[in-house]
């Protein structure tokens, strides 16, 4: 597939093909070449391919590969839900420079018992990223007046290689209850290739663990899960040299930073009540974070020599660096009740929840901890007006109370109401 270029007009090419399936060798492919703009030299190339095959009636394997190369692509901001918290929001966006991402995966599956689908699998995955990213951060202590977090707002180069090996086991320990257990190792290598600085390379090795139980019955169901997430610091947080592009707002990484771990626990239960199809549900989610990397700002009233960085900070300047802190945890709970209203062909749902967050970080040079209390109440009414027209009416009440050890208090009360129409 070729692209011809003309000087006078910008060119927009769009080619997408559906999955191609070959029954003989179980090969699946999809490919798209999108948005080539002659004026801005924008392009986006994406290729996916997968191969599935069976060696015997119990042994099979899957091979997958994908590549995504783009330049100047219009990306939307994405909230980093695992790194963000109630009082801090992180958004990331790839730059409009060239970005490359390649993923590969190989899986071998062995069915131990075909009657109950008990099986074991071995997975190897690899991911390579090369490009630039922008990170934007906001302090949300006052949700109605968010403040830019300059210490955590920056652009950085990505040249990362991540490899992961896992073993997974799927079985049924009890009747109507399935269990999935997986464990393995993850290796992340960060490289830096910047002309003005020496090359830098660091490798992090961490375990991966996931355990889940799912029970399904006619009138009740429940699930419980634990997962260990791990995050390597980015190159800005690790860079051992000083960035003096602004001599009065210096920035330096910390090569001794540890990778952070997030332990997440989830419990979900639903039960049908009586003969009127009323249902009640409970959701509890908790997490504990270790070695959280946070920014710390040090101020210098007089000219100061920084021996570790071999640099002299001018008077009235500041230095942003990074440290690991301990003590982050949160818990979120929600109770949901649903009931049909047959007279108007509708369903009503009432949801009440409570969230608590304990978040340590630095304000300047001082370590502080913010405690956030977040109760909520939500109403939903789903009406089927006709076979093709549905309307959902909702009303939400939300209260956020944050207080930190610097005696700062924020109280915010929200009330929203709305309606949505669905025409099929």
What annotation goes with each model-predicted range?
Residues 4-424:
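Primarily recognizes Gram-negative and organellar outer-membrane beta-barrels
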